[in-house]
Amino acid sequence: GNKVTTIQGEGDERTVSTVEKNALPGGKWEMIESLRGIDEETPSSCTRTVKKYTEGGWLTISRTEGYKTSLAQTTLYTYNDQFRVSLEIKPDGGYTRYEYDDQGRTVLSAAPWAGGGEKGTRTTYADLRFNDFRPATETEVIIAENGEETALLKRTYTYEDSPQASRTTVTETALGSDQVHTSVEEAYGEAAEYAYARGRQKMSQGIDGVQTVYTYEAATEYGALHKVTATVQAHGTIVPAQSTRSVHYLAENGATTRKEQYVHTGKDWSL
């Protein structure tokens, strides 16, 4: 095995981190990482990770937090023939199990439920483009011990992409309810005139109909490159005394150099 020790910081604040690697029988390795203060005997944290070499590369089969203490917590991992985690066993004995499609996308994640059986999420995918990991539907389900499933909640995602904007609409319906909650997210497309805006948030609308609309333009003051304006409105209209507008001036590194907050008076925007 080998052991590497690194010391960071200054004076009494220094910390010592140690990484130790050892070969174990059966093509496995363990890595023990610990961290302690320079004057301390006992590590403040110690983690042991065990990996096994397989056709799918190195796979983590267990991870222990608080290693070599009475509070040690170990998580175990089992893999399927795609070398993806099929079962994660938690330190408290609970678990999460995963099922995948042939593209390796999660189609089910489920864990024990207080009411007996399991509670989980089933996911289908949009498949509108190559390797599309965007969900088409997410259904929250209860899986009884006999395998029978009950849907509690279903979210449906629709995607509209144009050079101007990409729009994602999410509709949510709960079991036994005829209420449909809809939320919308939009991002600027490749055709956005101001290059900085491309791919950035254009509009977000909550299930209450309140929208925030974002615009981006070049800034010439406050040492900023970009000016981002976010306007809050309801159902597409400005509401006096309720609609707000915030302006952020952003430097080249993304830091905000100035922020302004306005409210609409009924005639115009006032600080």
Feature-to-residue mapping (PLM):
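Beta-strand elements of repeat-based all-beta scaffolds
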Residues: G1-K90, G94-L271
